[in-house]
Each structure stands twice: as structure tokens, then as C-alpha cells.
């Protein structure tokens, strides 16, 4: 080691280290919420019509139980059992979440979907009507930010739901604009490549520029439009794929 090296003093970390320390994602305490199960909605009776059969709206005091596989729906019955929580009822509990010391409120999927878990998206741009509306999301974001927290949504962009208009149109004909969004092959269960071979969750062909444009690349993409509504970031489902 030279005299110059000895007298140079301690090494200065690159600016990127300082930026990382200032990043709100670094070391944040994250509170995860399944909106349907978190806080009982006071308007439950008024929105019962949003759970048409074979969906079931359960009593808030009931304990979830494993159901049976529904061949006609290609899901388990417990996947379409609902407890009726929504975005307004979640907003009413923000003080509780704040007092726990949470830095980030992370919501499991809130977009339009067939099941209670929401990982089978029907439309990424719409909020499930039993949860509320995009205006409700904007109000939630404002209230979250007023408490010094961040709001993160679940980005389920590896696959969509089999009941989605995009998949149904793609499956109906090879000339559909959505045909290239999915990988069709009779060698797959259900005729299309699906996450974990779950036929209700056909995988998107992320390499397709049209899919990229719809999800994140386009000016009106899913990712950009929700960020404009006030959310702070995304948790990416199945990111390793």
C-alpha cells in the first residue's frame, strides 16, 4: 500500500448508496391487507347483488373453510366465498395501521377479478365493484399519504383470469388481437399455458410488445395510470418468471 493510499482517508461510498438509504422502500415496515377480509363494511346489505351465484357472501363471523372444486367454474368453491370488506371500510381503519408503525400499506389485488383472491384478473384498469371505485382508491391514497405512509398495489402481470374478456376473445379465434397475448397449445391443461397448470390462470406472453404496451410501456398503461391516481408503487407477483 502506497503513502498516497494511506493518506487518502476512508473510501467514500458512491452516490447510489446514499440514494438507496433515502429510498422509502429500504427497510420499510409493510402492512399487507386482503380488502375483502380486513374491515367489515357498513353498507354490506346494499351491495349483496354484487355477489351473484355461484359466489357466496358469508357472515362476517364465519371462519373460511376449504370447499370443493367446481368443474364448471374451474375454481374451488372457497375461492368465490366473500366477506364483503371494501375500500371505504379499510379507510376507516387507517389510524389503527398507522399506530402499528407501518410505513407502507400493501393491498392484495383490487382489480376486477372473478375470485376473492383476485389473482385471476379480468380487467386491470377496473376496481372490483364490491371494493369500490378508482375514486375510492384516490381517496385512500390521499389519506394514506396524509399519515406519512405509502400505498402499494399488487401487480399480477404474469397471468390473467380465464374468464377475462382478453382471454375469451383470444381463445375464440386466431384473428383476435389478443391471440398473441397467450400461449395456446393442446398439450397444456385447458389448451393454454397456465401458471402452475391452474387452468383458471392462463399466462401472458410478456415478450409480446402489445402486452408490454398494455401493462407498463404505453402512456395509458396499467402501471402508469394507477401511479397517476396516486399509488406509490407495485409489488410484482411471480416476478421471477
What spans do the regions from the language model cover?
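Substrate-binding/active-site clefts of carbohydrate-active enzymes
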Residues: 16, 22-28, 34-103, 110-229
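Extended acidic/polar, glycine-enriched regions
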Residues: 1-14
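Intrinsic disorder/low-complexity signal
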Residues: 2-3, 102, 142, 236
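Receiver (REC) domain switch/active-site residues of two-component response regulators
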Residues: 232
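Aromatic- and carboxylate-enriched substrate-binding clefts and catalytic-loop regions
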Residues: 239-241
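Conserved beta-strand positions in the central sheet of alpha/beta enzyme cores
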Residues: 106, 152, 235-237
